[in-house]
Every structure is written in structure tokens, then in C-alpha cells.
């Protein structure tokens, strides 16, 4: 199975290296890494249209795992597009985006470069996994990498259940493997932010702002990604790029408009 790895934390981030190490250690996978040359967190599904994209072979990383590592001066979506269309000799069977430093739960998926890298694969009709470790400071990515490889094998062995374009958003609690309760299939929960903009002034007296605030989560529904990771379950949420509100669509379809 040909696997393309990308992320939004940048090619030198420990999460993507741990993921690449896990995939490279398994005979059933053939991996290529194409990732941003710097951090691209919270870039959403942005693509680069006002400057050329450049690809560099990062040999010092590739030699460690004996797989190709390429950096791109663009976003995660750029990386996937460019890898599929120009860098790789063949279209990948699976794209894995991550392992992200920090959760991608609830509405995070709308801002996340990690999820957008996987979503770009879905748009290109490729199966994909977005994987995140639910802590910014936890340094052990090995458990998240192992669970992701396990899920990748399920996708590989059950092609009839996973159509091209399937996207699984995986969030792994930041605990030791023996503390995890298992894997739970979930839906997107409620997680957003209380936005606070801290106003400051530069030496010339001009105002500027830092965005701060805190996370607001609803953990009352145990079937959601937000609640499941709190209970130390690995959350797997199938998502797609079709944002149509079908209930409202059916209602509006009965409207009559004047010509």
C-alpha cells in the first residue's frame, strides 16, 4: 500500500517523524513524506496561488528511515496536491496527515491544516486519515502512530467498506498505551473558543492584537469525539467535504420563487 504522509506542523516536527517511522517499519506500506517546510497550523484549506511552490529533498531525514522526505514552501493542501500530481510516480492508496501536536475536535476541523491535508486527499478521491495527539506538550507520539497504522491496515484489508475519498479524523488521548480504553467511532462534538483579543501597543504607539481565550467543550454526549477522548478512547470520526444541510435543503426545495 502506497502511503503519502503530510502534516501542518512542518517536516521537522516530531509527530510526522514518529508516524513515518511507524509506517516505514511495516512491510505492507511504502511511504513518501511531503510536508510543509515550516509550521502551517490553523491554515485551514488554504492553497498557494501567488508564488511558485518549491520542493526540496530533505536527505538528512530520509536517510534515517530510508524513505523519501520532501519539504514544500506551502500549505498541507499544497503538499498533497503537489505530491499526487508531480512528486510521486504513482497515486497513493492512502494519505495520512499528522501526527498533529494538539487536538482536532469539533469545529477544529474547519481551521485545521492537518485535517485539510487529509481533506485534500478526499477531494482527489484518495482514502485518508487525519491524526492528532490531544496535548500540545506530550512528547511521546509512538502510541498515536501505532493506532494510526492499525487503522490504516483496517482500511487496506477492507476496501469494500472504505471508498476512495473516505476521511477518518482520529484523535488520540495523550496517555500511556495501557491507559487507553480502546477505539470508539464518534461524531463531531461541540468544541469552540471564547475569543479574546489582547490589545497591545508597539514602540510607535500603534495598536496590535494577540488572539487568546479559552476552549469551550460540551462533553455531555458520549458519542462525540470531544467526550470520547476525555474518557481515554481513541476517537475515529468519519467526515467529508460535503457541507450541505440536507434537512434545510429538503425544506427549501419546496419554496416557490417569483420569476
UniProtKB/Swiss-Prot annotation:
GO terms for molecular function: 3'-nucleotidase activity; 5'-nucleotidase activity; exopolyphosphatase activity; metal ion binding; nucleotide binding. A divalent metal cation binds at residues 8-9, 41, 100. Gene3D superfamilies: Survival protein SurE-like phosphatase/nucleotidase (3.40.1210.10). The keyword Metal-binding applies. The keyword Hydrolase applies. It is an enzyme of class 3 (hydrolase). It is found in: Cytoplasm. Pfam families: SurE. Its cofactor is a divalent metal cation. GO terms for cellular component: cytoplasm. Keywords: Cytoplasm, Hydrolase, Metal-binding, Nucleotide-binding. It catalyses: a ribonucleoside 5'-phosphate + H2O = a ribonucleoside + phosphate. Coiled coil: none annotated. Binds 1 divalent metal cation per subunit. Its EC number is 3.1.3.5. InterPro entries: SurE, SurE-like_Pase/nucleotidase, SurE-like_sf. HAMAP family: SurE (MF_00060). Nucleotidase that shows phosphatase activity on nucleoside 5'-monophosphates. NCBIfam families: PRK00346.1-4 (NF001490), PRK00346.2-2 (NF001492), surE (TIGR00087). Belongs to the SurE nucleotidase family. This is 5'-nucleotidase SurE. The gene is surE.
Amino acid at each position: 500500500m502506497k502511503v503519502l504522509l503530510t502534516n501542518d506542523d512542518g517536516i521537522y516536527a516530531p509527530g510526522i517523524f514518529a508516524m513515518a517511522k511507524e509506517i516505514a517499519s511495516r512491510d505492507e506500506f511504502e511511504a513518501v513524506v511531503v510536508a510543509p517546510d515550516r509550521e502551517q497550523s490553523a491554515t485551514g484549506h488554504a492553497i498557494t496561488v501567488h508564488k511558485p511552490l518549491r520542493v526540496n529533498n530533505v536527505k538528512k531525514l530520509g536517510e534515517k528511515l530510508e524513505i523519501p522526505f520532501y519539504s514544500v514552501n506551502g500549505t498541507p493542501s499544497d503538499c498533497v496536491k503537489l505530491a499526487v500530481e508531480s512528486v510521486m510516480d504513482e497515486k497513493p492508496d492512502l494519505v495520512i496527515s499528522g501526527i498533529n501536536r494538539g487536538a482536532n475536535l469539533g469545529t477544529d476541523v474547519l481551521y485545521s491544516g492537518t485535517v485539510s491535508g487529509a481533506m485534500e486527499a478526499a477531494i482527489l478521491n484518495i482514502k485518508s486519515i487525519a491524526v492528532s495527539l490531544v496535548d500540545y506538550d506530550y512528547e511521546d507520539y509512538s502510541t498515536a502512530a501505532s493506532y494510526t497504522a492499525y487503522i490504516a491496515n483496517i482500511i487496506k484489508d477492507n476496501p469494500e467498506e472504505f471508498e476512495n475519498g473516505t476521511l477518518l479524523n482520529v484523535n488520540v488521548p495523550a496517555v500511556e498505551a495501557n491507559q487507553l480504553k480502546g477505539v470508539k467511532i464518534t461524531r463531531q462534538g461541540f468544541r469552540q473558543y471564547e475569543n479574546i483579543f489582547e490589545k497591545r501597543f508597539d514602540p510607535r504607539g500603534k495598536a496590535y492584537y494577540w488572539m487568546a481565550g479559552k476552549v469551550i467543550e460540551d462533553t455531555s454526549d458520549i458519542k462525540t469525539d470531544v467526550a470520547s477522548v476525555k474518557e481515554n478512547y481513541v476517537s475515529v470520526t468519519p467526515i467529508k467535504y460535503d457541507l450541505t444541510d440536507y434537512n434545510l435543503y429538503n425544506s427549501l426545495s419546496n419554496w416557490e420563487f417569483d420569476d
